[in-house]
């Protein structure tokens, strides 16, 4: 593809004078404790890995106010966005190994930076081939969530760096008739499997033909308690559903990752808004991850919109970033490059923002519980009061 637009942030910094830029960034990206989000120094080992292996690193720091009784709960979070590593016509195993080789170097950089919790993008170990509606060869990427090769690789890296790693994958559930699921496996810092979450909302729009392969999760909204904090995974399309975000928060999540695969024409104006809103209204940190690059497939497919058949999904625009409970957000990765985004956060900020805004105290859950109970009744009638003067 020809030269792509790198990022909104890079363009602002290139063309807006420094004084005005400071105010623009305050309004667009928010303040943390009265100032712009601070940068975090990147160690030389991580920089060398990035330069040698052609990926970018950004790092930031989100602080909480000091407290008298609670010590700071400092955790380093990492998110990785990546393109595929081989042509989609290559043998399946070659495609997987090419991606694994990329990811290993980026996890090495995360380890050098002392990342505690790392999340990869949606189905990181394969092309996002669900646009094709073809079952084979793409379902051959599906594997066991406990013994698959991608999980064994992630377990090895988790042990190596004492790191909790979330591995979003295409799961083959051998226990239940070999059904396929869009799953995120949570691997503990000892390399143990803590549990798994699945995609709650499956898109049926444009080229997102995912229900051809898997259906909605029945696991609910699990939150995983780790030595570094309470973690949840809201996979991709679930970010468009406010109640999905809410449920993870009510279950106690402090960090919610949103591993995604989404393209510019469909969702890019929404990308910088949804996760920040969720972080603020639910009082937790959010790591938003999107794959990057344009993936071309061997056979043409259509989008159901009357336009010509094509062989690519469109451009996955990356732009992975973190959102904070206080509604600031960190610098994002670019729209065009593989990358690692790191943010050092103080989890005490979650409670501090709850105490400030009182969203949970003022939420009126009973009001909405009754409304939703009424709404799902087949005989529900909307409460619409009509102007009597209307004819």
UniProtKB/Swiss-Prot annotation:
It comes from the Eukaryota. It is an enzyme of class 3 (hydrolase). Pathway: Amino-acid biosynthesis; beta-alanine biosynthesis. Keywords: Acetylation, Hydrolase. Its EC number is 3.5.1.6. One of its GO terms (molecular function) is beta-ureidopropionase activity. The modification N-acetylserine is found at residue 2. One of its GO terms (cellular component) is phagocytic vesicle. The active site is at 122 (proton acceptor), 199 (proton donor), 236 (nucleophile). It catalyses: 3-(carbamoylamino)propanoate + H2O + 2 H(+) = beta-alanine + NH4(+) + CO2; 3-(carbamoylamino)-2-methylpropanoate + H2O + 2 H(+) = (R)-3-amino-2-methylpropanoate + NH4(+) + CO2. Pfam families: CN_hydrolase. Residues 75-347 form the CN hydrolase domain. GO terms for biological process: beta-alanine biosynthetic process via 3-ureidopropionate. InterPro entries: Aliph_Amidase/BUP, C-N_Hydrolase, C-N_Hydrolase_sf. Belongs to the carbon-nitrogen hydrolase superfamily. BUP family. Homodimer and higher homooligomers. Catalyzes a late step in pyrimidine degradation. Converts N-carbamoyl-beta-alanine (3-ureidopropanoate) into beta-alanine, ammonia and carbon dioxide. Likewise, converts N-carbamoyl-beta-aminoisobutyrate (3-ureidoisobutyrate) into beta-aminoisobutyrate, ammonia and carbon dioxide. This is Beta-ureidopropionase.
